[in-house]
């Protein structure tokens, strides 16, 4: 259905789809953070280590609620990237923010991956083997996927011509 909504004259799927995928990625990440903020624990212990058990107020407020809200802002950005870009400064701003989201997510994913694989941070980081494994196999790839999706959405921003009318 989504693919049928955005087709260019040559019959290829246009990049507007990537904006919708970026939106879904961000909203899913927000939902997970809100689940954790409300007391859920699935996956948090291997992500946040001791903070997951202690749950200090600053961690819940900033690390869970704050990040969840930031992810919702990312969802709005992904949605905006899916639609025809407004002319002028607003359109350039949306696209620039898409590229910024791409860069931040890729840098975060790659840098943490490199730090964990090379053990550059040393023993001072207090990262358990279980945390390291889940971070390398699940969390960092999630950031890398998000970065790639936002990059593809920003690259194609403004190229979508809107919903096809169904007429050939």
Language model region names:
Residues 8-12, 32-64, 85-86, 122-130:
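Interfacial loop at the N-terminal end of multi-pass membrane proteins
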Residues 141-161, 168:
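Membrane-water interface at the C-terminal end of transmembrane alpha helices
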Residues 33, 75-78, 112, 150-157:
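Structural signal for membrane-spanning alpha-helices in multi-pass inner-membrane proteins
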Residues 2-15, 80-102, 160-168:
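Cytoplasmic juxtamembrane regions at transmembrane-helix boundaries
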Residues 24, 30-31, 39, 55-80, ...:
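Core segments of alpha-helical transmembrane spans in multipass integral membrane proteins
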Residues 60, 96-100, 128-146:
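Individual transmembrane alpha-helices with interfacial aromatic-anchor signatures
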Residues 28-40, 103-119:
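C-terminal TM-helix exit segments that contain a strictly Trp-centered aromatic cap at the helix terminus
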Residues 115-116, 122-125, 131-132, 165-166:
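Mitochondrial intermembrane space
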């Amino acid at each position: 259905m989504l693919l049928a909504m955005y087709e260019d004259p040559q019959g290829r799927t246009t990049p507007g789809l990537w904006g919708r995928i970026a939106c879904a990625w961000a909203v899913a990440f927000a939902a997970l953070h809100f689940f954790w903020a409300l007391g859920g624990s699935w996956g948090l212990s291997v992500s946040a280590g001791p903070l997951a058990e202690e749950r200090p107020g600053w961690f819940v407020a900033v690390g869970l609620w704050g990040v969840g809200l930031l992810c919702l802002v990312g969802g709005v950005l992904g949605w905006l990237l899916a639609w025809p870009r407004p002319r002028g400064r607003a359109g350039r701003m949306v696209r620039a923010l898409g590229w910024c989201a791409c860069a931040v997510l890729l840098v975060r994913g790659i840098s943490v991956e490199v730090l964990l694989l090379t053990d550059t941070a040393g023993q001072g980081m207090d990262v358990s083997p279980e945390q390291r494994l889940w971070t390398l196999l699940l969390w960092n790839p999630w950031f890398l996927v998000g970065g790639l999706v936002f990059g593809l959405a920003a690259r194609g921003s403004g190229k979508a011509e809107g919903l096809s009318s169904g007429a050939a």
